[in-house]
Swiss-Prot record:
Protein name as it appears in the record: Integrator complex assembly factor WDR73
GO CC terms of this entry: cleavage furrow; cytoplasm; cytosol; spindle pole
Organism from which the protein derives: Xenopus laevis
Family: Belongs to the WD repeat WDR73 family.
The keyword Mitochondrion belongs to this UniProt entry's keyword annotation: no
Localization annotation: Cytoplasm; Cytoplasm, Cytoskeleton, Spindle; Cytoplasm, Cytoskeleton, Spindle pole; Cleavage furrow
Keyword Metal-binding: no
Annotated GO biological process: cytoplasmic microtubule organization
GO molecular function term, any single one: protein-macromolecule adaptor activity
Domain of life per record: Eukaryota
UniProt KW keywords: Cytoplasm, Cytoskeleton, Repeat, WD repeat
Length: 369
């Protein structure tokens, strides 16, 4: 145990009231989490992280060592997705197919409540749930949908539909995100991917990761935002542990590929997740395969689908925690700190929330240290 702790610069173990599937940054000092228990009311909380974890310089001794509840609210439904509307105090949540999307207002500093202000209808069919994405715009808007042919853009204030993507097919959606304020990326569970312009109907380009017809394999993706003259890059991971990096301008041709020996296949698509590190070049993180989070450096990858080793694996949830039924916890969500290079937050099914920063380690590509 002591040897494992030496691998970290920082490792903080917090206990939430219940497990969460969402970890959403609100600014760079607080996060939103929400419960997903279908048998009871769930909390939606905005938590201020300790000063040591958001200070840009070493603050020395800090009196606050725990998470502090800034705002909170209750919902009668499980929360599967939560997104903050940029430059606003609004958040949007989605849950099971039978539930609407909820729009919430985070109260001002003198009020500690998160209160619902409106709902949007969900189009989710049986066995699916609505994915959501937000972007900066003059008027708050949300992109939402559960299937490729049902994705739409809605104005939050008026609740009026602004645009329908107009893409054919009932493929279940796993990932929705904006490349910019007008361009949308969609990844479907079966590996189908497309780019669409919200000003025009239909897909501008389309491709697929993985082999068509493998219904047992689920894919999800994350997009690394473009910077200056560097184009966006899509990272995709499958429930069997395959990864592909692609250029959004040509989704059918992988630039880099990898596979790794997963401890167990992802149990289902609900916890499968991949993220780009916002402040660490070429690094991605993957969770949903048991109680760990894997960090990969993609710099030296090529287009060959071969085994690569992670540069770091956070096993804290499986080592330090146990669920009420005695099973090993599964990581349910993780997110990178917005600007701290190696700092990651991860949540697990036992209600634990870890904030960790790993030490410098030799970077390898799975073939050499």
């Amino acid at each position: 145990m002591l040897e494992s702790i030496r691998l970290y610069k920082d490792l903080h173990d917090f206990e939430l009231q219940g497990p969460t599937r969402v970890v959403e940054w609100i600014g760079d000092k607080s996060i939103c989490v929400a419960g997903y228990d279908s048998a009871k009311r769930n909390e939606i909380l905005q938590l201020l992280i300790p000063q040591k974890l958001h200070a840009k310089e070493n603050p020395g001794l800090c009196p606050e060592r725990d998470l502090k509840v800034e705002h909170g609210g209750f919902i009668d439904e499980p929360v599967y997705s939560l997104k903050h509307i940029p430059q606003s105090s609004l958040i949007v949540t989605s849950g099971p197919a039978s539930c609407p999307l909820w729009v919430w207002q985070i109260g001002p500093e003198d009020r500690d409540v998160i209160q619902p202000i409106s709902t949007l209808p969900s189009d989710a069919g049986k066995g699916t749930w609505t994915r959501i994405a937000t972007t900066t715009s003059a008027s708050p808007q949300i992109l939402h949908g559960s299937q490729a042919d049902s994705i739409r853009l809605t104005d939050i204030e008026s609740t009026k539909q602004i645009h329908t993507l107009g893409v054919s097919g009932s493929d279940g959606v796993s990932t929705l995100c904006f490349l910019d304020s007008r361009t949308v990326f969609v990844c479907c569970m079966n590996g189908r991917q497309f780019i669409a312009d919200i000003r025009m109907p239909g897909a501008a380009s389309e491709g697929r990761v993985g082999e068509e017809g493998l219904s047992c394999v689920t894919w999800c993706s994350a997009v690394h935002p473009s910077k200056e003259d560097v184009c966006s890059t899509v990272a995709s991971v499958s429930s069997e542990g395959h990864m592909c990096l692609t250029d959004p301008r040509n989704l059918s041709v992988p630039l880099k590929c990898a596979t790794w020996c997963t401890p167990i296949p992802a149990a289902s698509e609900q916890f499968l997740s991949i993220c780009w590190a916002p402040a660490l070049s070429d690094c991605i993180s993957v969770s949903g395969f048991g109680g760990s989070v894997q960090i990969f450096d993609t710099k030296r990858w090529d287009s060959a689908m071969k085994e690569r080793e992670a540069v770091f694996i956070h096993k804290g949830h499986s080592v330090m925690g146990t669920c009420e039924d005695g099973r090993e916890p599964t990581v349910t969500a993780h997110a990178w700190h917005p600007w701290k290079e190696r700092t990651v937050l991860s949540a697990a099914s036992d209600g634990s929330l870890h904030v960790w920063n790993w030490s410098d380690l030799p970077v390898h590509d799975g073939t050499e240290l």
